[in-house]
C-alpha cells in the first residue's frame, strides 16, 4: 500500500527545499488514500479541490502547502459535512470553520473528510453510517473514537496530520489506541465556530499527529481568538514550537492514585510506570496528588453531554438542511420520521437520555447534580495544580478492544473514557503520546500516556512530551 511516511516537520522542510511541490505532495497523499483498502479512515476526499489550493500554496508559510485530513464534523467550504450520519448526507458546507480558515491562512490544504462516530457520539469508530473504521495496528480492533478516522489516517500513513474534535476524550483515546499524538487544547484556545456541536461546553478541536513537534506546529496554526465564537478565549497565543526544547528538570509531575489502580490492564500499568520513571530520570519531581471525585466523572459527563446533545441535535429536523423524510402527512410526522430514519442507535440513545435528565421531574435529581460534580472536579484540579505543573496517567485503562465488543457492553465502552473525561469537564488542556505496547492475542497494541496541565499551558504538555520522545 502506498503510504506517506515522515512527519509534518520533515515534509515542510522538503517542500521549502523544493524537493517536491505542494501539488506533488497532494497527489502522493491522495494516492495513499485510494490505495488503502483496510482502515476505512476516510468518508471522502477531493483531489481536484486540493490540487487547486496547492497551485497557490506559499511554501514559506507555516504549513507550506501540506495536506491535512479533517474530521467530518468540521466545516470546509464547498465540501460535504456529514458527521458520519445519514441525516446530513446531502449537506455541503457553505463556509469554512474558523479552524479551517486559519489552517488555510497558515498554508495548510484540507484533504479528505475522515470517518467518525456519528455526530461524535461514540468511543469506538463503529457508530458511523459509512462503515466501521479499523485500527491500522490491528485491523480486528477498534481505533477508538470519536475521531476514529483522523487517528487511523495518521497511524496508517494516509495522512501527514489531521484535525479531530474532543468532547470526552475523542482525540486522545483514539490517539492512544493507534499509537499517535493527540492534543485537546484548553477550552476556548481553538474556535468552535464551524464545528457541528455535540456538547457545546465540552467540545474542542485539536491536532492529531505522528510527533509532539507536529502537534505544536498544527496547534499554532489553528489557535487564536475568534469573535464568531462567544466561548473563544481572548488571550495571547504563545510560540508552541519554542516550548519544545525546554528542560523538564524540576518539573513537578502529579501522580494521582485514582489513575494508577489495579483496574488498569497490567501491561498498560507497566508502560505508564516506565514513562513516569523516564520523567524522573530527566529531572522531574514526582508528587502524589488526589482527585477525590474521579469516580463520579463518567456519570456526570454522560448526563451533561447528553443533555447538551439533545438540545443541539434538535435543529436537525428535515426543514432547513440535511435529509428530509418523504411523503410526511404533516410537520410532526416530518420531524419524527426524519430523525427516526436519519439518526443511528447511539445518537438516539443519547438524545433520549439527555431529554430525560432535562425534564422537569428529573432536572434537579440528575442534571443539577451533575453540574455540581463538574464544579467539584474543576476544584480538585485547581487544588492539585497549586502543587504540581502537570498531572499524568494512562490515556485508557485497557488496550483497544476487538470490533464488536463495544456493542456487547455499552457501559464498559463508556467507562473507557474515565481518564480522559476530567479534562473536558474542567476545560483543561490534555495530550496523549505513545508509551509502548501491550501484547494481546499475538498482537502488539499501542498504549497512550496522558498528560494534563493548567488552563492555557499547552506549552507544558508539549515540552514534556517532546522530552519523552527524544
UniProtKB/Swiss-Prot annotation:
Residues of the active site: 71 (charge relay system), 146 (charge relay system), 170 (acyl-ester intermediate)
The UniProt record lists the keyword ATP-binding: yes
Short name of any one Pfam family annotated for the protein: Amidase
E.C. no: 6.3.5.7
GO biological process, one term: translation
Top enzyme class: ligase
Record-linked SUPFAM superfamilies: Amidase signature (AS) enzymes (SSF75304)
A molecular-function term among this protein's GO annotations: glutaminyl-tRNA synthase (glutamine-hydrolyzing) activity
Keyword field contains ATP-binding: yes
Reactions accelerated catalytically: L-glutamyl-tRNA(Gln) + L-glutamine + ATP + H2O = L-glutaminyl-tRNA(Gln) + L-glutamate + ADP + phosphate + H(+)
Gene3D superfamilies: Amidase signature (AS) domain
Coiled-coil region(s): none
GO cellular component, one term: glutamyl-tRNA(Gln) amidotransferase complex
Assembly description: Heterotrimer of A, B and C subunits.
Record's function text: Allows the formation of correctly charged Gln-tRNA(Gln) through the transamidation of misacylated Glu-tRNA(Gln) in organisms which lack glutaminyl-tRNA synthetase. The reaction takes place in the presence of glutamine and ATP through an activated gamma-phospho-Glu-tRNA(Gln).
Protein's recorded name: Glutamyl-tRNA(Gln) amidotransferase subunit A
Source species of the chain: Akkermansia muciniphila (strain ATCC BAA-835 / DSM 22959 / JCM 33894 / BCRC 81048 / CCUG 64013 / CIP 107961 / Muc)
Amino acid at each position: 500500500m502506498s503510504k506517506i511516511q515522515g512527519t509534518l516537520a520533515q515534509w515542510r522542510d522538503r517542500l521549502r527545499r523544493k524537493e517536491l511541490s505542494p501539488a506533488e505532495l497532494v497527489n502522493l497523499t491522495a494516492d495513499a488514500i485510494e490505495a488503502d483498502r483496510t482502515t476505512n479512515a476516510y468518508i471522502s476526499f477531493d483531489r481536484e479541490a486540493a490540487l487547486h489550493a496547492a497551485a497557490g500554496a506559499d511554501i514559506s508559510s507555516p504549513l507550506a502547502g501540506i495536506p491535512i485530513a479533517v474530521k467530518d464534523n468540521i466545516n470546509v467550504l464547498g465540501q460535504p459535512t456529514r458527521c458520519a450520519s445519514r441525516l446530513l448526507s446531502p449537506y455541503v458546507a457553505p463556509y469554512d470553520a474558523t479552524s479551517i480558515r486559519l489552517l488555510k491562512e497558515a498554508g495548510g490544504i484540507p484533504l479528505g473528510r475522515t470517518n467518525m462516530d456519528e455526530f461524535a457520539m461514540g468511543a469506538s469508530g463503529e457508530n458511523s453510517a459509512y462503515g466501521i473504521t479499523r485500527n491500522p495496528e490491528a485491523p480486528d480492533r477498534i481505533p477508538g473514537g470519536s475521531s476514529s478516522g483522523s487517528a487511523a489516517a495518521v497511524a496508517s500513513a494516509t495522512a501527514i496530520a489531521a484535525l479531530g474534535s474532543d468532547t470526552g476524550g475523542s482525540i486522545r483515546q483514539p490517539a492512544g489506541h493507534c499509537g499517535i499524538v493527540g492534543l485537546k487544547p484548553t477550552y476556548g484556545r481553538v474556535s468552535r465556530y464551524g464545528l457541528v456541536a455535540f456538547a457545546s461546553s465540552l467540545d474542542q478541536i485539536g491536532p492529531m499527529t505522528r510527533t509532539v513537534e507536529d502537534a505544536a506546529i498544527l496547534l499554532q496554526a489553528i489557535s487564536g481568538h475568534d469573535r464568531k465564537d462567544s466561548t473563544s478565549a481572548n488571550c495571547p497565543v504563545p510560540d508552541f514550537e519554542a516550548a519544545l526544547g525546554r528542560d523538564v528538570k524540576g518539573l513537578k509531575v502529579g501522580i494521582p492514585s485514582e489513575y494508577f489502580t489495579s483496574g488498569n490492564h497490567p501491561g498498560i500499568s507497566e508502560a505508564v510506570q516506565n514513562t513516569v520513571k523516564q520523567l524522573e530520570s530527566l529531572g522531574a519531581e514526582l508528587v502524589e496528588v488526589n482527585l477525590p471525585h474521579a469516580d463520579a466523572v463518567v456519570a456526570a459527563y454522560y448526563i451533561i453531554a447528553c443533555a447538551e446533545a439533545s438540545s443541539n441535535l434538535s435543529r436537525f429536523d428535515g426543514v432547513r438542511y440535511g435529509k428530509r423524510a418523504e411523503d410526511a402527512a404533516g410537520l410532526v410526522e416530518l420531524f419524527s420520521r426524519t430523525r427516526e430514519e436519519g439518526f443511528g442507535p447511539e445518537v438516539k440513545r443519547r438524545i433520549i437520555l439527555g431529554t430525560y435528565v432535562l425534564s422537569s421531574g428529573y432536572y434537579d435529581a440528575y442534571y443539577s447534580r451533575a453540574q455540581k460534580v463538574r464544579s467539584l472536579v474543576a476544584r480538585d484540579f485547581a487544588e492539585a495544580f497549586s502543587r504540581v505543573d502537570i498531572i499524568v496517567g494512562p490515556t485508557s485503562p485497557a488496550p483497544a478492544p476487538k470490533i464488536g465488543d463495544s456493542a456487547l457492553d455499552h457501559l464498559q465502552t463508556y467507562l473507557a473514557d474515565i481518564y480522559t473525561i476530567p479534562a473536558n469537564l474542567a476545560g483543561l488542556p490534555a495530550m496523549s503520546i505513545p508509551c509502548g505496547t501491550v501484547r494481546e492475542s499475538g498482537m502488539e497494541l499501542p498504549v497512550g500516556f496522558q498528560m494534563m496541565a493548567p488552563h492555557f499551558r499547552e506549552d507544558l504538555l508539549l515540552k514534556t512530551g517532546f522530552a519523552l520522545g527524544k
